[in-house]
């Protein structure tokens, strides 16, 4: 037999915890939307060959532009291809690291009560 007010384990205290959890989830959702907009506007640069080739992507890894110096063009197609690929990888790594850091900032300290 359960005591008064205990019911199915969803007493007033649990309802407050649940309401707080929903409030925090809503805050995270709003923060995630703002973060998504911010990431879209970012320009993160990857480079190769000491700056001969630069690739600029958004915080969401969306390519924005590629800059190739005349010196890189003079190196020939094979080397240019390698430089572009290396710059793309560099930009991708920097962009994903930025996204991960921003997501950690958004969710740090998130304590869902009762879970």
Swiss-Prot record:
- Give yes or no: UniProt keyword Cytoplasm: yes
Q: Name one Pfam family in it.
A: YbaB_DNA_bd
A single cellular component GO annotation: cytosol
Mention one GO molecular function. Answer: DNA binding
Keywords, in A-Z order: Cytoplasm, DNA-binding
Q: Which residues form a coiled coil?
A: none
The record, for InterPro entries, names: YbaB-like_sf, YbaB/EbfC
Kindly list the places in or outside the cell where this protein is found, as annotated in its UniProt entry.
Cytoplasm, Nucleoid
Q: In UniProt terms, what function does this protein have?
A: Binds to DNA and alters its conformation. May be involved in regulation of gene expression, nucleoid organization and DNA protection.
- Assembly and interactions? Homodimer.
Q: Which HAMAP family match?
A: DNA_YbaB_EbfC (MF_00274)
Q: Which PANTHER family does the entry mention?
A: NUCLEOID-ASSOCIATED PROTEIN YBAB
Sorted alphabetically, which NCBIfam families does this protein's record hold? DNA_YbaB_EbfC
Q: Which family does it belong to?
A: Belongs to the YbaB/EbfC family.
Q: What is this protein called?
A: Nucleoid-associated protein alr5067
